[in-house]
């Protein structure tokens, strides 16, 4: 790891100003992705701007039809928050199965979304729930936020402040995970709204994506049988040491069916 400077920001404007003044600086939240990259000398930021003590980034609010989570809230706090568990249990359940205890105690929702790892869990929730990512300067719909592998719509000096999740009628998340890392080989988040069903998949491609065929089938008939009857193409899916594209394509309707069963209680 190369040497770097560290400073703790006290508000979003100060954090953004520090990054704007140094193009080689990086925001630091839980550090669960950034610090390992730095240890391998794959990243060499000149400064780390710690945003974990900014009060505006640490709050959780549950209002009528919406759950708002500050960007610096760790996974464990999302999982354990009583109001989140009541209003949006699928999100709490997702957070409670990210990584191990250390990762859940340090990793943050904002850091996960900004990093946009292809196998991360939170992007599937953001996409399926039609979340809005609130930054220090604008509001970004989830459909516009995730651009590609480790890429988002964020500007280099733009800071996520909070994430707003609409509350669906029913929802569930199911993943087939790597037993060592707990990353998803395939993860499926299903959300049923009055307007229809949204299905988002992580771990299977270069970035999170929705599956229109499953959404149409489940909007017409919200049953596991309807999900299992859908065939998903493997043409744009990943093949790696963990699973082939064909196997991932097979898993998507299987896990979707399990998520529907889970959502139906």
Which residues fall in each region the model found?
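C-terminal structural segment of proteins
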Residues: 1-265
């Amino acid at each position: 790891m190369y040497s770097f400077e560290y400073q703790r920001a006290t508000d979003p404007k100060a954090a953004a100003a520090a990054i704007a003044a140094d193009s080689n600086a990086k925001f630091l939240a839980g550090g669960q992705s950034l610090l390992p990259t730095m240890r391998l000398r794959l990243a060499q930021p000149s400064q780390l701007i710690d945003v974990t003590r900014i009060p505006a980034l640490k709050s959780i609010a549950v209002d009528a039809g919406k759950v708002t989570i500050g960007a610096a809230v760790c996974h464990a706090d999302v999982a354990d928050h009583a109001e989140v568990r009541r209003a949006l249990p699928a999100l709490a359940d997702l957070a409670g199965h990210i990584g191990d205890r250390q990762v859940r105690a340090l990793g943050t929702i904002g850091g996960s979304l900004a990093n946009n790892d292809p196998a991360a869990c939170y992007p599937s929730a953001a996409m399926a729930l039609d979340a809005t990512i609130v930054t220090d300067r604008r509001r970004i719909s989830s459909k516009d936020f995730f651009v590609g592998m480790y890429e988002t719509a964020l500007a280099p000096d733009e800071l996520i402040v909070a994430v707003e999740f609409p509350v669906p009628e029913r929802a569930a998340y199911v993943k087939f995970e790597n037993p060592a890392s707990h990353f998803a080989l395939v993860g499926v988040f299903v959300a049923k709204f009055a307007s229809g069903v949204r299905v988002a998949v992580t771990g299977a491609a270069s970035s999170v994506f929705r599956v229109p065929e499953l959404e149409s089938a489940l909007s017409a008939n919200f049953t596991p049988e309807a999900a299992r009857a859908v065939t998903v193409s493997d043409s744009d899916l990943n093949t790696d040491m963990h699973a082939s594209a064909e196997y991932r394509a097979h898993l998507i309707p299987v896990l979707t069916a399990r998520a529907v069963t889970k959502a139906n209680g």
